[in-house]
């Protein structure tokens, strides 16, 4: 897919299709009015006849509009002008792209990027349009024998900006949007792979493939024998029931000075979670291939920052593991000694992600990090609390939490800060060990974060629970690519990347 920006009037555009908006009720945007004028009132006559009301997402594809150089004009309903917000804008762009792709318009000039969106500028509108386009066109066809692709798919999009002085901003937005989309696609491709293909070794191989592509990226791994020597017995216990070896992949992006403390991202990489001995119900268990969504998100974010070659140092950890029932599997009642030396009583083997992450979070102390962010499909409780719209953010450092929430607002990849109060720590008490791996039903996402917080006392840390946002079920089942946009924005902010650079 090719993207570009230009600044010009619609009547001078020669393309397969021009895309312009119509507000509700039946009111042409200023750009559409220019086309209406040169066509002798052709568009306004259609609206008077009631062919298009202008409701959000309505589409009307016109062929051979009088005096218009382009073959087609796509009228897009944008709703009420004063009510156009971020969510509606992205939905309109997505539906527009799907319509263009399905109707044989191989290229188009889109003027929707000139629409006024509350509190958003040209950079945001163009970048979100690029990301929404790539998201709308995403397919996972690698394992299908019949691909079912459109005969004449959309191949080129031009987004118009209001003035020539905004061309540089628009070009920057395209560059950033493409890099974020690249990372999101990597995340989705890896997460959508079935667990008989995507195992911990597969995660490592995908990281190595990126290493071959980018000069500043170095990839290494820690195998089970090395984990044992390091005392990572909690991590090892989770994978004991699987024939697939646990592998922790280490990705290092070295874009900053050698003495710059790195930002560390740690992704939970349970490539399949059966629940272990505390086995899950059969319904929707297939979706537990997405329990490596945290690792997939970190892999995608590392792809984005490598593509942008951000001038900072970032370490990405993919904590690969598989939780299966077996004669060798760990059991409820077991007491595990973690890499930190703290002991954990296992109450439920399906609360395994935190047992993998706690050792990974201890391991990363060796990098003397500026900060650490772990990303995990950790708890169903977070889905109950926040649904499928927002990622839960927990942190032991207020400025870091604010930075992450700010990045979520900038990127449109929504997040909400959750409490991490000492009162919740009491729910983890054990009569036999330093703590249990389960805090009971109340506040399940918070007690899981409290568990992790006991292994992060040596650095500033945030935990992102993406259980509700990493994938969707049902007819449109698949990975969402989140939280790559949010993580990428956070890292771009840290690198001092601005829209005008």
From Swiss-Prot:
The active site is at residues 280, 354. Mn(2+) 1 binds at residues 273, 350, 352. Mn(2+) 2 binds at residues 268, 273, 291, 352. SUPFAM superfamilies: Macro domain-like (SSF52949), Zn-dependent exopeptidases (SSF53187). One of its GO terms (biological process) is proteolysis. Its EC number is 3.4.11.1, 3.4.11.10. One of its GO terms (molecular function) is metalloaminopeptidase activity. It is found in: Cytoplasm. It catalyses: Release of an N-terminal amino acid, Xaa-|-Yaa-, in which Xaa is preferably Leu, but may be other amino acids including Pro although not Arg or Lys, and Yaa may be Pro. Amino acid amides and methyl esters are also readily hydrolyzed, but rates on arylamides are exceedingly low; Release of an N-terminal amino acid, preferentially leucine, but not glutamic or aspartic acids. GO terms for cellular component: cytoplasm. Its cofactor is Mn(2+). Keywords: Aminopeptidase, Cytoplasm, Hydrolase, Manganese, Metal-binding, Protease. Coiled coil: none annotated. Gene3D superfamilies: Leucine Aminopeptidase, subunit E, domain 1, Zn peptidases. Binds 2 manganese ions per subunit. Pfam families: Peptidase_M17, Peptidase_M17_N. Belongs to the peptidase M17 family. Presumably involved in the processing and regular turnover of intracellular proteins. Catalyzes the removal of unsubstituted N-terminal amino acids from various peptides. PANTHER family: CYTOSOL AMINOPEPTIDASE, LEUCINE AMINOPEPTIDASE-RELATED. HAMAP family: Cytosol_peptidase_M17. This is Probable cytosol aminopeptidase. The lineage of its organism: Bacteria, Pseudomonadati, Pseudomonadota, Gammaproteobacteria, Alteromonadales.
């Amino acid at each position: 897919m090719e993207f570009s920006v230009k600044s010009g009037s619609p009547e001078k555009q020669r393309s397969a299709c021009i895309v312009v908006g119509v507000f509700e009720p039946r009111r042409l945007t200023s750009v559409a009015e220019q086309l209406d004028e040169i066509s002798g009132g052709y568009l306004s006559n259609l609206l008077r006849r009631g062919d298009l009301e202008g409701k959000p997402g309505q589409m009307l594809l016109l062929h051979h509009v009088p005096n218009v150089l382009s073959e087609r004009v796509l009228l897009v309903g944008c709703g009420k002008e004063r009510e156009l917000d971020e969510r509606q804008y992205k939905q309109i762009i997505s539906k527009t792209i799907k319509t263009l792709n399905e109707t044989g318009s191989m290229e188009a000039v889109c003027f929707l990027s000139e629409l006024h969106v509350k509190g958003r500028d040209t950079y945001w509108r163009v970048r979100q349009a690029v990301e929404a386009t790539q998201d709308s066109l995403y397919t996972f066809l690698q394992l299908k024998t019949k691909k079912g692709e459109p005969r004449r798919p959309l191949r080129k999009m031009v987004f118009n900006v209001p003035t020539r002085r905004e061309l540089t901003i628009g070009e920057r937005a395209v560059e950033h949007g493409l890099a974020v989309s690249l990372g999101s696609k990597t995340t989705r491709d890896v997460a959508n792979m079935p667990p008989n293909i995507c195992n911990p070794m597969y995660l490592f191989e995908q990281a190595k493939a990126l290493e071959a592509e980018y000069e500043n990226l170095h990839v290494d791994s820690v195998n089970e024998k090395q984990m044992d020597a390091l005392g990572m017995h909690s991590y090892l216990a989770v994978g004991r029931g699987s024939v697939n070896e646990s592998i922790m992949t280490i990705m290092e992006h070295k874009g900053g000075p050698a003495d710059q403390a790195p930002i560390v991202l740690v992704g939970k990489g349970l490539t399949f979670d059966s629940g272990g001995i505390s086995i899950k119900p059969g319904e929707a268990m297939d979706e537990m291939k997405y329990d490596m969504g945290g690792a997939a998100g970190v892999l995608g974010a590392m792809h984005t920052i490598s593509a942008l070659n951000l001038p900072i140092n970032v370490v990405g950890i993919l904590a690969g593991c598989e939780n299966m029932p077996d004669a060798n599997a760990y059991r409820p009642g077991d007491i595990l000694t973690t890499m930190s030396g703290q002991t954990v009583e296992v109450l439920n083997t399906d609360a395994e992600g935190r047992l993998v992450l706690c050792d990974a979070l201890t391991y990363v102390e060796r990098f003397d990090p500026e900060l650490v962010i772990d990303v995990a499909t950790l708890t169903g409780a977070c889905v109950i609390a926040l649904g499928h719209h927002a990622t839960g953010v927990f942190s032991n450092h207020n400025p870091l939490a604010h930075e992450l929430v700010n990045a979520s607002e900038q990127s449109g990849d929504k997040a909400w800060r959750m409490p991490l109060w000492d009162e919740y720590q009491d729910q983890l008490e054990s009569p036999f060990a330093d703590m249990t791996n389960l805090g009971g039903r109340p506040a399940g996402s918070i007690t899981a974060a409290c568990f992790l917080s006991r292994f992060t006392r040596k650095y500033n840390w945030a935990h992102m629970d993406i259980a509700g946002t990493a994938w969707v079920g049902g007819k449109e089942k698949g990975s969402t690519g989140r939280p790559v946009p949010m993580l990428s924005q956070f890292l771009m902010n840290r690198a001092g990347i601005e829209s005008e650079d």
